[in-house]
Every structure is written in structure tokens, then in C-alpha cells.
């Protein structure tokens, strides 16, 4: 399908283009302030029209995978692609007086083959013009691109866009949309971390995962002095189409996105992921299997946090498992969930390249009723930090059938801390290691006779201090094995309590062990719930080996 022909044909209101008076007035009044890069025909645009467009598109066959790019772009190396820079003199709102925000576009090339169309919208008249690709919008530097192959190819489109905010206009971006339906944002550290997506399809099924694309964006012209703007997007894939509205607030210490989507199923969908996010966890306090580097921890996120519909708060530390793991946490109208990076201490990472201590958390706050479903978490084995291996999303309980229409409203918070947190005691850290011996005797001259795994969970905040004289009770539930040597320790350096126990196997099974714990005082819960998944070693590995060489 020719997307340019479709988008123009789907907008019945495009008849306004025939009015030369309106067109002349609009081009002079609205687009002159935007560096004149919007050069397409004038068409009327609004969100209702975009929804109609997406609904009509769902009744047509999918247009298929992206077509080929000119060889000079298709064969770019990552280094060459990164050297292509958008010319800031041609930024979308370059001519807006007292602008606090600006937009630049990404070049197509390398793995970014989908030709994404961009439109500028005047918010007063609701008229839009397309921004066509041309080489003069970019600086190719030493990328080695043969620009003669690009001349006259206005249908190349763009790969995505990024947003800049004063006082760092044209220097450091705060929002990025690039590739399929992926997008990211930063907090006040300007350090990117995990990503979000518009939609996830069949992430964990017996079929192949499907990655929908944002194929077009419409930008409402930002007002002078404003740090909020609105962008609309058309989503398209083999199984579904969608109309999206993003109201993006670029605040001083965080980026907040109000997202509204309307989805139209082309065919039955086995697994639909709403508000999906993708992150990386290689190693941390609780999992050091592949941490043979100079860095104590390597991760974009350290936990999945959930505020369930019944009010329960959940902390689920992330893992880097040896086998792919998928867990679905059932819920009804969740209040919120997210992948968080709460450990912000540089000394815990010692990384001057990745700066993992500066990476943002991402919290999802549903704004309408989502009904029954599950917060789904997939963890994939990884040996390093260059591949994302954590996926999280909301999966509706109801099966999605061809012709179904769905709508989800939610808010995304990109910030150091989530906007809400449990008033009860919270999990600060999870640690695991050798068990079966008294603390302070690790392991001494004699290794323990019986193999065990030790877990230490640190809690802070809430009413822990007030509860301590009355008695704090750890309530531990295990899917297999036994918890022994349970200890409650006050730890002055972080002014909290450490709950420590040893897990002993009761069978030879290597199936994951689901662990659950919360703190109780006089029958009342005084902490959020800690969830964990532990992977026991094979029976022949459940022994301690003294590998000392005595001379």
C-alpha cells in the first residue's frame, strides 16, 4: 500500500486544499514561523479524523514490511549512521519566538528502514502540511553517504524524531521516537535508559513476535514559552492499527506523557501488550551470575513495581535467568506498575560510560478502567549490557478478535522516582549468596555440611520503628523448599531492617522457586510484598568446593 496515497485519500476533509485563500493565509501565518520546512499540501487534521483513518486502514490488507532503501543508506555501519546529524537550522520550531521546545528528525538508514511521514499542524486552524525529506535538512559529515542517490526522493520520509528543551536546544534531547513503535525519555540527568513501545504483540507465544510501526506523526505547533506539546501517531502492523495521542510535558526534573490510544484489530491476536516497556538487567545485588566485570551492578532497571487494584504494593526484583522466564501477575483495574531504577548510588555501579545510576524509572498510571488482565514480565538470558532482556506490559484477559476496537488511556512518568509509593515499609535491596552458616563465619575453615541459599531483603520506611517493640513477623511463602534460620536485624547505616533466611531444597527439582514475603505486626501488614523467583542449581551442583591450594 502507498501510505502517502492512503493518508491523503482517507482524509475526506482535504477538500479544503482547494481554497487558495485559506491555503495562502495558512502558509503565511502558521508555517512561516516553523523554518518553512513543512512543504506539503495543506489538509485538515484532528484526532477524530486520525481515528477514522486507523479504523479504515484496519479493513485493508497490511502494506507489508518496509521497502528497500538506496544502497548508500541500507549499508551504513552504526558509526556512519550516528555521524549523520540533523541541521538544527532547519528544526521544526526554529522560527518560533521564545520557544522552549524544538523537534529534529532522524535519517532513515541502516536498520531503520520504515519511511515515517511527518506533518506540522496549526492548532488554531487544524490544518496540516507534510514535511518531506530532502538532503539539505541533514549534515552528513563523514558518514560516506552518496547524496546524489537521495536527490528527488522526497518519499524517503524519516526514521523518527527527537525533542529538545531549553536551555539545551539543539544540544541534548529529552524525548526520542525511533524504530518500530519505540520511544524513550529522560529525567533531569539527560541519561537515556529503558524504552517504551506503542504496542506489543505476541511477545511470548508459540508464534513470532510482531513489532507494529508508527508510520506517521502529526505535531501540534508548540506555543511560545510552553514546555508541553502534543503529537499524534498512526500505528500499523499485520494484526492491528491504532490512533495515538501523546501530550508530552517536558518538566524540569521529569517527562510526563499522557497517552490515549484507539486500537482496531485486523485479525485475532493471541497476546496484546498495552503500555509495554523494554529494559536491561545483566547483574545486580541479587544476581551476579554474569557479573565478571569491574562493575558491581549493570542494569537499566532493578525491579518491577506494582500497585494492584486491591491496593497491595508489590516489589519484584529483576533477574537475568539461565532460561527465558515469563510470569503473569493477575490483576483487576491496576492502579499502576513500572520498571524502576531506584539505586542511584554511583559507587554501586562504578560505570563512567553507561552511568546506570542516572537512568530513569518508568511508571505507568492507567487513566481509564482496564478491567481484568495481568502485568506480564518476560526475562531473557543475556551475557552483557548491549541487549535488552526485560519486557513488561499489561495483557488484557479478554481475547482479541478481528474487528475488535479497544481504547486505553494512561500516563507515563519518566523520572528518578515513581510519582507514588507505598506508605508501608518498602524494599530497598535484595541480596543472595551462600547459606547454611552463621553470619560472621563465612564459611570459616569448614564449609557447611548441607547446601543452602541465603536471602537478605532490606526494608526501609513506613512504621517499622514503631512496630519493632511490638514484634515484626516475616510472612514467607515458598512454592517449594523450606525457609530456615530466619533473622530480623536492625541495620543502622540505612536505618531499616534486614530480613534474612536460608532456603533449603526438599527435592531435586530445578524448577523456579516462587518466593513471597511481607512483614506483619499484630496481624496487620506493615510492608509492601516482596516477590522473587529463584532458580536452584542441579542436585550435583548443590555442594561447596574448597578450591584452595595449600603449600
UniProtKB/Swiss-Prot annotation:
It comes from the Bacteria. The gene is mdoD. PANTHER family: GLUCANS BIOSYNTHESIS PROTEIN (PTHR30504), GLUCANS BIOSYNTHESIS PROTEIN D (PTHR30504:SF3). Belongs to the OpgD/OpgG family. Keywords: Periplasm, Signal. Residues 1-32 form the signal peptide. GO terms for biological process: beta-glucan biosynthetic process. This is Glucans biosynthesis protein D. Gene3D superfamilies: 2.70.98.10, Immunoglobulins. One of its GO terms (cellular component) is outer membrane-bounded periplasmic space. InterPro entries: Gal_mutarotase_sf_dom (IPR011013), GH-type_carb-bd (IPR014718), Glucan_biosyn_MdoD (IPR023724), Glucan_biosyn_MdoG/MdoD (IPR014438), Glucan_biosyn_MdoG_C (IPR007444), Ig-like_fold (IPR013783), Ig_E-set (IPR014756), TAT_signal (IPR006311). Probably involved in the control of the structural glucose backbone of osmoregulated periplasmic glucans (OPGs). HAMAP family: MdoD_OpgD. The lineage of its organism: Bacteria, Pseudomonadati, Pseudomonadota, Gammaproteobacteria, Enterobacterales. Its main location: periplasm. Transmembrane segments: none annotated. It is found in: Periplasm. Pathway: Glycan metabolism; osmoregulated periplasmic glucan (OPG) biosynthesis.
